[in-house]
Amino acid sequence: VDVVNASAEEYLRRDGLRFDWIYADPDRRSDKGRKLVRLEDCSPDIVALKPRLKQVSGRLCVKNSPLFDVGEALRLFPDSRVEVVSLGDECKEVVVYDDGTGPLVTATALGRGSFSAAPGETAPPPGRFDPERYGYLVIPDVSLQKARLARIHLAGKADIWSDNSYGFAVEEPEGVLGRTFAVESIEPYDPKRLKRELKGREAEVLKRDFPLAAEELMRRLGLHAGAGLRLAFTKIGNDFWVIRLK
């Protein structure tokens, strides 16, 4: 192992360089300490260095911020594999493997598994939402949500209307990346009625595809943080719903 004290730009100007893989983890902080997301703003500028990196190696791996957009990754590296990595349902990084084996998008939940699909692959839309049908709610792992793979992953296992929403299943699905809860009831979101019924109670509030933050929902409904109830809020089409979980 050779340790080189030089900037990437300076080092890549050297002659005779050739590597099997290049791994880049650009500095994502500005001179003033501000967090950076755009790859072109990071140091070194991997986008500007791409032509030289291609000469030095046919394989490039770039570690990006968890906020980095998958679509932007594929725009910058069209033939790459893009992997969204999560741990404990928290997105940790977006990794680009620019080695000509793509395009492919992968969601990896560490300790749970992975799921891959080609960009643009779609799942058939589910039918009309019928709250009486469903016995289980699926919360797709955040890696699926970030990679926009939730609908494809749950196809045939649960009905889901958006990559940012919940899945609804008649029977408990197996082999899904995410958490599954038995449903007690699904009902229209009626804040006045809910507040009359639930004010002062402890609850865990979950939400996806819903315009209010969990904290704001708790405030409006008079709830306190706790394990007494588990409520999930979502929007499907033009309608808002609350799901009581067992």
Walk through the language-model features, giving the residues of each.
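SAM-dependent transferase fold signal centered on methyltransferase-like domains
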Residues: 1-246
